[in-house]
Amino acid sequence: MVDAEMAAFGAAAPFLRKSEKERLEAQTRPFDLKKDVFVPDDKEEFVKAKIVSREGGKVTAETENGKTVTVKEDQVMQQNPPKFDKIEDMAMLTFLHEPAVLYNLKERYASWMIYTYSGLFCVTVNPYKWLPVYNAEVVAAYRGKKRSEAPPHIFSISDNAYQYMLTDRENQSILITGESGAGKTVNTKRVIQYFAVIAAIGDRSKKDQTPGKGTLEDQIIQANPALEAFGNAKTVRNDNSSRFGKFIRIHFGATGKLASADIETYLLEKSRVIFQLKAERDYHIFYQILSNKKPELLDMLLITNNPYDYAFISQGETTVASIDDSEELMATDNAFDVLGFTSEEKNSMYKLTGAIMHFGNMKFKQKQREEQAEPDGTEEADKSAYLMGLNSADLLKGLCHPRVKVGNEYVTKGQNVQQVAYATGALAKAVYEKMFNWMVTRINATLETKQPRQYFIGVLDIAGFEIFDFNSFEQLCINFTNEKLQQFFNHHMFVLEQEEYKKEGIEWEFIDFGMDLQACIDLIEKPMGIMSILEEECMFPKATDMTFKAKLYDNHLGKSNNFQKPRNIKGKQEAHFSLIHYAGTVDYNILGWLQKNKDPLNETVVALYQKSSLKLLSNLFANYAGADAPVEKGKGKAKKGSSFQTVSALHRENLNKLMTNLRSTHPHFVRCIIPNETKSPGVIDNPLVMHQLRCNGVLEGIRICRKGFPNRILYGDFRQRYRILNPAAIPEGQFIDSRKGAEKLLSSLDIDHNQYKFGHTKVFFKAGLLGLLEEMRDERLSRIITRIQAQSRGVLSRMEYKKLLERRDSLLIIQWNIRAFMGVKNWPWMKLYFKIKPLLKSAETEKEMATMKEEFARIKEALEKSEARRKELEEKMVSLLQEKNDLQLQVQAEQDNLADAEERCDQLIKNKIQLEAKVKEMTERLEDEEEMNAELTAKKRKLEDECSELKRDIDDLELTLAKVEKEKHATENKVKNLTEEMAGLDEIIAKLTKEKKALQEAHQQALDDLQAEEDKVNTLTKAKVKLEQQVDDLEGSLEQEKKVRMDLERAKRKLEGDLKLTQESIMDLENDKQQLDERLKKKDFELNALNARIEDEQALGSQLQKKLKELQARIEELEEELEAERTARAKVEKLRSDLSRELEEISERLEEAGGATSVQIEMNKKREAEFQKMRRDLEEATLQHEATAAALRKKHADSVAELGEQIDNLQRVKQKLEKEKSEFKLELDDVTSNMEQIIKAKANLEKMCRTLEDQMNEHRSKAEETQRSVNDLTSQRAKLQTENGELSRQLDEKEALISQLTRGKLTYTQQLEDLKRQLEEEVKAKNALAHALQSARHDCDLLREQYEEETEAKAELQRVLSKANSEVAQWRTKYETDAIQRTEELEEAKKKLAQRLQDAEEAVEAVNAKCSSLEKTKHRLQNEIEDLMVDVERSNAAAAALDKKQRNFDKILAEWKQKYEESQSELESSQKEARSLSTELFKLKNAYEESLEHLETFKRENKNLQEEISDLTEQLGSSGKTIHELEKVRKQLEAEKLELQSALEEAEASLEHEEGKILRAQLEFNQIKAEIERKLAEKDEEMEQAKRNHLRVVDSLQTSLDAETRSRNEALRVKKKMEGDLNEMEIQLSHANRMAAEAQKQVKGLQSLLKDTQIQLDDAVRANDDLKENIAIVERRNNLLQAELEELRAVVEQTERSRKLAEQELIETSERVQLLHSQNTSLINQKKKMDADLSQLQTEVEEAVQECRNAEEKAKKAITDAAMMAEELKKEQDTSAHLERMKKNMEQTIKDLQHRLDEAEQIALKGGKKQLQKLEARVRELENELEAEQKRNAESVKGMRKSERRIKELTYQTEEDRKNLLRLQDLVDKLQLKVKAYKRQAEEAEEQANTNLSKFRKVQHELDEAEERADIAESQVNKLRAKSRDIGAKGLNEE
C-alpha cells in the first residue's frame, strides 16, 4: 500500500505502517547474512551480534554493546535481511525463531506499531498510552478491506470476522486473551465500537430512536461504561482491570444489519468489595460516587466525600492517576440514561452501593461474660437499613441472633463477633454480586430487539492469567478458565488443524508441539480432582481447610506432575500447594476455600431483604433459596437442587457453556502481550515477553501456519469461484467432477504445485497462495470487464452512428419532398386537391373519431375499475402476507412449546419412575423399621422390669454398705494400732542389723579361708549365668529386632519420600550444574584460574573423605565397645534383680513376723509389682533407645556416605563447597558446645516422661471412678431444677391468665395463640435437641470404640506383664541358691522396704479417708435430693390446684396445656439425656485428646532423644577418648556414686518426715471438711424454710390479687379522692420492692435453689405493679397494699437476717478452707518436689552406675592380656567364696531372728489376733461382694441406658421415615397431577396446532388463488395498456 493509499487512515497512518521512504532507508542498511546473528544473553534473552571467528564448534561474536562472547554454534541464530524488518506478518520471516519474533515485535513497538500478524492470529502489545488509531476515519478505512490490503489492526480482525459471517454463513467469535494488564478490555471495546460504527454506516437511512434512549449502536457502546464502573478496579498490574469475564454476542440479520446484542458475565471477583491489597482499590463506582461531582448523591446516600471514612473501600489506594472519577461518574450516569434505566432504578443502584459502604462501618462487641455479639452503636446500621428499606432493629437482630433451621424447625442462634463480621461481609458481597448480575440482565433487556437475527459475532474478554504473592480460590478459577481457553487455542490451532489433514487424506506427519494442557485441566475438573474434592469437602459438616489439604496431598502429591508441594519462603504468604500452569507455577493458599465455595448467607437477613421496601433489593433476593429450603413446585428441572450448587460447580457449568459456544463458532484469536511490569510506555522487558510468547503458543502457531495448509475451500466453491482463471480447462456444457475440474484448473495455472494439496472434499493451500489466486482472479476479472466495457462502448457507438445515418437520410427525403412541394404548391389543380381531399374523408373520420371516443371512454372506465381492483388485491395481498408471517411464527412457537412440553413430559415420566422406585424402597424400609420397633418395644418393657428389680437391689446394697462402712472405721482404728506396733518392731530390727554387721566382721577372716575351695564353683556359676543371660539377650534382641524392623519400615517409607525430594533437589542441582557449565564455556578466559581452585578443593575434598572414613571406623569401634557394655550391663542388672527379689522375700517374711495383715501384704505386693513394672519399662525403654541409636548411627553413616558422594559430584563448584565446609564446622562446634546441655535435657525428659505417665494413670482412674456418680447426680439435680423452673413458669402463666380472663374474649384468644406458638417453639427445640442427641450419640459411640480399643491394648500389655512376672519368678527360684547378697545392699533394701511399707500404710489411710468423704458427699446429696423431691411434690400440689381453677374457665385451654406438658416432659427427658451424653462425650474426648497429646509428646521426646543419641555417638566418635581417660572418668563416677548414695539416704529420711506431716494435715482437713458439710446442711435447711415462707407470701399475694379484681368497680368511683394517697404508697412500695429484690439477689448468690423462688416473688411484685397502674385507685386497695407492704417488710427483715448469718458463717468457713487448702497445697508441692528430686537422684545414680559399668567394660576390653584376666577371675572367685560364707552366716542369723519374731508375735497378738483375722476376712468378703454387685449394677444400668437410647433413636428414625414417606407420597401425587395436566396441555396444543395448520393451508390456498387472479388481472391491464397505446399512436399518425 503506497503512501497515497495510507492517506485514507489520516493521523493514524504513522502508527500503522511506516512511509515508503522510511522502509527504503531501513532496507538499505548494511547487512551481512553470514555474520549478523542473534546470541543468547542472561538478561536480555537474545542480543544482536556479529561473528568474529569460528573455532571447533564454538563461535566468538561481538554484541551491539561491544561485549565479546563465545557460545556454541547451535546457539547462534541468523538475523533476517533488512527487508523483513518490522514485517507485518511474522509468518513471512525467512528465519523463524524466538529472537526473530522477539525483535520484530520490539522494533514495531518502538515505532508504536502495536499490532502484528502472527500467522492466523494477531499479536498486540500494550502501549500504556493513547494512540490515535481508533477514530471513525480509521474505522471507515478498514471497512471491506481484506487482511492483506491494510496494516494489522484489531479493526481488520473484526472486519474479517464480519465478512466471514456473511460469506460462510457461520457464527464467528473473537477471543482476546492475555495476562492481566495486557490490554484485553481496551481491544474488546474497540471491537464493539467497530461493529457499532459499520452497522450505523450501513443502516443510516432506517434509524429509529426511542425517546429518552439512544440508538441500538449507542446502547451497545454505552454498555461498557456501566459495566466498567461496577466491574473494573485498579490492580497491581492494571489501573482499569476487568474483575469479571464477559462474552458479548452481537447479533446480525441475514443482510449484515445489526439486530441486537447480549452479554454474559463470568466470575465477578466479589471478595474485592470488602477487601483489597495495599496497591489496589475497590470497584470504580464507589470512588465515582465520592468524587462529589453530583452532590445530591452524597445527600441521598448519607455519606461524605472522604473514602477513608469507610472501611470496605479504604484498605488500599483511593485514587488513580490515570482515572478521573468525577468524569467517569458522569459517563456512567449518562450510560444509564442511554440504556433506558429509569431514575428509580438508578437511585436504587446508588442506594445499595452506599448501603454497602455503611455496612463496612457497622461495629459489634462481645457481651460481658458471654461469647455472643451485640451492636457497638447503631448509627451505621440505621443508615444502611434506611437505604435498603429495612428496619434497623430487625437487621441488627438478624445479624446477631439469626434463626437457623434444625430439622424441620427454626431455632435462634447466638453469634460471636467474628461470625457477625463474616456474615456482614458475605451479605455485602452477595448484594453487590446480585446487583451486578441484575444490571447485566437489565442491559440485555435493553439490547434485545424484535428484529430478525441470523448470525452473531461473539467477543470474549475474560480475566487474564494471575500470579500474585497471595493466590486464593478466585485465582484458581481465573487461571483454570485461561487454561481451558489456551487448550482450546492449542486444540484449534494444532490438533484440529492436523486432524483435518489426515481426515482429508493429505500426506502429513503429525507434529507434537508439546502444548497439550489436558493434564492440568483434568487435575482441576475431573472426578477426584481439585474442584471435585473441594465440593466433596463442602458436603461434610466437620470438614476444614486442613482436611481438604490432606485429601489433595493423598490423591495428587507424587501422582500428578502438575501438583507440587510449595516451597514456603520467609516474608511471603504461606502456600499449601502448587500447580504448574501453562503460564508458570502458581502457589495457592487454601484458607477459607470451603467457606468461599459454599458461599453461605445469613438467611434471616436475606428474609428481610426479600421483604424490603426497596423494590430492587427485594427483586434481587426474591428467588433466593437457602441450603435448607425445599424445592419449589412447578419450576421444572432447572430449579431443582440449585440452592445446593457450589461456586466451583456453577463456574464449571458456565465455563462449559462458554466452551460449547466457542466450539460452535469460527474463532479469531487476538493475543495481548504485557511489555513490562512497570506500566512504562515504549519499554520492552525481553524475558517477560518471551515467557508470554512461549506460553501462548505464538511460535508454534507461526510454524504450523508455514508448514501446514491454513486455507481450504470445497471443490464446488473453488470451481465456481476460480473457473474464470482458465475457462478452457472446464468446458461449458460438459459434465466434469468438481475435484477433477479443480485439479485441471490448478494444473493449468502458473503456480507452484507444492503449495496446494487435494483432499477428499476440499483443496488445501499454503499460506499466501489463496491470496495469490485472489489477485489473479481480480486481474482476470479486470481484463474481462475491460473487454466487456470496450465491446459495449463499440456497440453503443455503432448504434449512435446508425442513428446519425438514418437521421441524414430522413433529412434528405424531407428536403426533396419540400423542394417538390414548393414546386407544385402554386399549381391550381394542387390547390383544388388540397381543398377537396379533406372533405372526402371528413365524414369517415368523424365516424371513426366518435367510435374511438366511445371506445376510449369504455376502456378508461375499465382501466379505473382494474386499477381499483388491483389496489384492493395488493392491500389484501399485503394483509395476507402479514397473516402468513404471523401464522408461521405462531406455528413455530407452538412447535417449540410442544417440543418443550414433550421434553418436560419425558422428564416427569422418568422422575415418576424414579420416585416410584424410591417409594417402594422406603416402604420396604418402613416395614423393616416397624418390625424392629416392635422388637425393641418388647425389649424395652423387659428392661424396665429388670431396671425396677435392680433399683430394689441397689437399695438393699446401700443399707449393707452403710453397715460395712461402720465396720470399716473400726478396722481402720485397729490398723493404726498395728502400724504403731510395726514401728516398734522396725526399731528392734535396726538393732539386730547392727549386731549382724558385727558378726559379719568377725567371720570375715573365716570366709577368706574358704575362698580357694569355691573358685571352681563360682567359675561354673558364671559360665552358667553367662549362657542363660545370652539366651535372655537373644530373646530380648529378637523382640527388639521386630520392633526395630517396624521402625525401619516406617523410616523406609519416610526416607522414600525424602528420597523423592532429594532427587528433585538433585535435578535442580543438575540444572544449576548445566547452567554453570554453560557460563564456564562462555567465560573461557577464567577457566585456568577456576581449574587451579578446583584442584585445591578436590584435595580438600579428599582430605574430608579421609576424615569421614576415619570417623566411620572410630564409630564402628565405639559401637563394638557399646555392645560389650550393654552385655555387661545386662549381666549386672540381672544380678541386681535377683538380689532385689531375695530382699523382697526376706522383707515379706519380716512383715509376716511383724503381724502385718493380709490386706497390707496385698498392697505391698501390688506396690512392688508396680515398682517392678516401672523398672522393666525403664529397661525396655533404654534398650529401645539403644536400638534406635544404632539405627540412627546406621542412618547417619548412610547420610555421611551420601554427603561424600555429593561432595564428589559437586566439588567443581567452589561456592557450594565452601558453604558446606563452613556449615559442617558450625555444626561440629554447636555439637561440642551443646553436649552437656543435651545430656541434662535427656535426663529431664526421661523424668518428665515418667511423671506424666503417673499423672495420666492417676487422672484416668479418678475420672473413671467419679464419672458415673457425678453424671447421675448432676442429671438428677438438673432435672429437678428444670422441673422447678417449669412449675414456676406455669405458675406465672396461670396468674397472668387469671388476670386476663376478665378482659374479654379477644384477650383470651390472643393468649391461646401465644400458647400455640410456644408449643410450636418447644416442638422445634425438641427436634433440634433430638438431632443434636443423635449426632452426640454417634460421636460417643466412636469414642467408646476407641476407648475399648485402648482398654484391649492395656489388657494385652497386662497379659504380657503377667507373663514376664511369671518368667521372673521362675528365674528367681532357679537362681535362689546361687545368689550372693552383699551386706550393704541388704541394709539399703531394708530401708527401702520400710519406706515402701510406710508409703503403703499412708496410701491406705488416704484411700479410706477419700472413701469416707465420698460417702458423706453422697449422703448429703441424697438428702438434698429428698428435700427437692418434697418441694417438687408441694409445687405439683399447688400446680394441680391452679389447674383445677384453670379448667373451670375453659376446657380447650386445659387440652392445649396437657399437650404442652407432655411435650415438655419429653423435651426434659431428651435434654437430660443430651446433657448426660454431652458431659460423658466431653470427658471422653478430653481424656482421649490428652492421651493423644501425651503420646505425641512422648514420640517427639523419643525422636529428640534418638537424635541426641546419634549426635552424642558422633561426638564420642570424633572426640576419640582414650582408655586411660575413660578409666579416670570411671573413678570419678565411683566417687560421685558414693556421694549420691549418701545424699539419697538423707533425702529418703527427709521425705519420710514430710510424708508424716502430710498425713496429719490430711486428717485435719477431713475433720474440717466434715464440719463444713454439716454447717452447709444446716444452711440448706434454713434456705428451705425461707423458700416455704416465700411460697406463703406468694399465696397471700394471689388472694390479694383476686380481691383487687373484685374491687375494680368500686375503685373507679373513688379514683380522684385516693390519688394523693396512692402516690405515697407507691413510693413506699417501690422502696420495699427494691429492698426485697436486693435481699433476694444476695440469697440467690448463697443458694441456687432459692433462685426460682425469688424469681416468683419478683414476678408477683411486678404483676402487682402492673395491676396498680391499670386499675383505679381505691381505698380498699390501699389497705390491702399496706398489709402487703408490712408482710414484705417482715419477709425482707427475715431474709436479711438469714443472709447476714449465712454470709458470716460462709466467710469464716471459706477462710478456714482457704487456709487449709493453701497448707495442703504447699505440702503437696513439697511432696511432689521431693518425689521429683528423688526420681532425679535415682536416674542420676542409675546413669552413673551405667557409665561406670561401661567404663569398666571398656577397660576390660582394652586390657585383654591373660594375666589380668586370671587376676580378675581369682578375685571374683575369692569374692564369691566370701559372699557364700556370709550367706550361710546370714541364714543362721535370719533363723534366729525368725525365732525371736515368732515369740514376740505370740506374746503381742495372743489375745486379739483370731478376732482380728475374722473381722478382716469378713471385711474382705463384704468388699468383694460389694464390688461385684456394683459392677453388675453398673453394667445393667449401662445396658439399660444404651437400650433406651437405641429405642428412642429407632423411634425417632421411624417417625422421620414415616414423615418422609408421606412427603414423598404427596410429591408423587402432585407430580402425577402435573403429568396429567401436561398431557392435557400437550393434547390441547396439538389440537390447536392442527387447527392452525388447517387454517394456514386454507389461507395459503386463498392467497395462491388471489395471486393467480391478480396475475390475470395484471396481464389484462397490460394488454389494455398496450392496446390503448396502439390506438393512441394510430390516432396521432392519422392526425
Swiss-Prot record:
One of the entry's Gene Ontology molecular-function terms is: calmodulin binding
Compartments, record wording = Cytoplasm, Myofibril; Cytoplasm, Myofibril, Sarcomere
Q: Enumerate the spans annotated as IQ domain.
A: 781-810
| N6,N6,N6-trimethyllysine PTM sites in chain numbering | K129
What S-S linkages are listed for this chain?
A: none
What does the protein in this record do? Myosins are actin-based motor molecules with ATPase activity essential for muscle contraction. Forms regular bipolar thick filaments that, together with actin thin filaments, constitute the fundamental contractile unit of skeletal and cardiac muscle.
Instruction: Please report the name of this protein according to its UniProt entry.
Output: Myosin-7
Q: Which organism is it from?
A: Canis lupus familiaris (Dog)
